UniProtKB/Swiss-Prot annotation:
Gene: DMAS1
Assigned EC number: 1.1.1.285
Pathway membership: Siderophore biosynthesis
Lineage: Eukaryota, Viridiplantae, Streptophyta, Embryophyta, Tracheophyta
Protein's name in the database: Deoxymugineic acid synthase 1
Role of this protein: Catalyzes the reduction of a 3''-keto intermediate during the biosynthesis of 2'-deoxymugineic acid (DMA) from L-Met. Involved in the formation of phytosiderophores (MAs) belonging to the mugineic acid family and required to acquire iron.
Entries under InterPro entries matching the protein: AKR, AKR4A/B, Aldo/ket_reductase_CS, NADP_OxRdtase_dom, NADP_OxRdtase_dom_sf
NADP in keyword set: yes
Length: 314
């Protein structure tokens, strides 16, 4: 059982993120094993992260050593990268993912971005010539085939606006179960949350702490004076206050830390709650999206502005 429960769609409420800079298989493998011991059951990866193989190794060892009874006790999520967001490349991409993971299926397979690149473009920097128009219908039909074949128990999307979800739902035979997007106290996603609830789509938060330390991240979440004051008054860390806030919205969340102490802290958000006054203070924090997808916007590409990429929703 997951230490933190599951959403109605079956997605564990708290997952371990594994997007790391550079090839680091040993730390990822060790961190996943320790996370399983601590109670994590959801592990979030992607073809673009290059961490699928160590997650698969850790999962196999966890089953072999009895940390979990079987593969079915774990929930593994991966994502198809933009270079494989083509009708004829989605299924082969998932088969490679499964080979990396040494698994017969993933629990959730998602479209990483509503973006298509030329085949083979996996590493930045990207040029305008690398981008092609995103054929949402073709890509989603390929995702549905992955589900029908039993290779993905569920399918979803990442970084989709309300407008893009509306378009997808207009033709999808199998609707997306999850939309994984940036959510934190500095980017609260009220409109998107309301839309997804109405449509039965589970939100899952990435960068719930603001992705401090990444090339695109920000200190604005962890350095928030409001969050520091609330944390001090409750005897919690700022990270715990952020994660608890996301948790109270009904969202699932992905949090990345390979430090054992912080991994434990990040699970300790379930048996306490924020007061109404604290929620109100957080609701008034000025809003600013941190991960704007800058590298996918180009005057010569399909998305010529942030307005086009996010449909005016940032």
């Amino acid at each position: 059982m997951s230490a933190t429960g599951r959403a109605p769609c079956g997605l564990p409420r708290i997952g371990l993120g594994t997007a790391v800079q550079g090839p680091r298989p040993d730390p990822v493998r060790a961190a996943v094993l320790r996370a399983i011991q601590l109670g994590y059951r959801h592990f979030d990866t992607a073809a673009h992260y290059a961490t699928e193989a160590p997650i698969g190794e850790a999962a196999a060892e966890a089953v072999r050593t009895g940390l979990v009874a079987s593969r079915e006790d774990l929930f593994v999520t991966s994502k198809v990268w933009c270079a494989d967001a083509h009708r004829d490349r989605v299924l082969p991409a998932l088969r490679r993912t499964l080979s990396n993971l040494q698994m017969e299926y993933v629990d959730l397979y998602m479209v990483h971005w509503p973006v298509t690149m030329k085949a083979g473009r996996f590493t930045a920097p990207f040029t305008p010539e690398d981008f092609e128009p995103f054929d949402m219908r073709a890509v989603w039909e390929a995702m549905e085939e992955c589900h029908r074949l039993g290779l993905a128990k569920a399918i979803g999307v990442c970084n989709f606006s309300c407008k893009k979800l509306e378009t997808l739902l207009s033709f999808a035979t199998i609707p997306p179960v999850v939309n994984q997007v940036e959510i934190n106290p500095v980017w609260q996603q009220r409109k998107l949350r309301e839309f997804c609830r109405a449509k039965g789509i589970q939100l899952c938060a990435y960068s719930p702490l603001g992705a401090k330390g990444t090339h695109w991240g920000s200190d604005s979440v962890m350095d928030s004076g409001v969050l520091h004051e609330i944390a001090k008054s409750k005897g919690k860390t700022v990270a715990q206050v952020c994660l608890r806030w996301v948790y109270e919205q009904g969202d699932c969340l992905i949090v990345k830390s390979f430090d054992e102490g912080r991994m434990k802290e990040n699970l300790d958000i379930v048996d306490w709650e924020l007061s109404e006054e604290e929620r109100q203070r957080i609701s008034k924090i000025p809003q600013r999206k941190i991960n704007q997808g800058r590298r996918y916007v180009s005057e010569h590409g399909p998305y010529k502005s942030f307005e086009e990429l996010w449909d005016g929703e940032i």
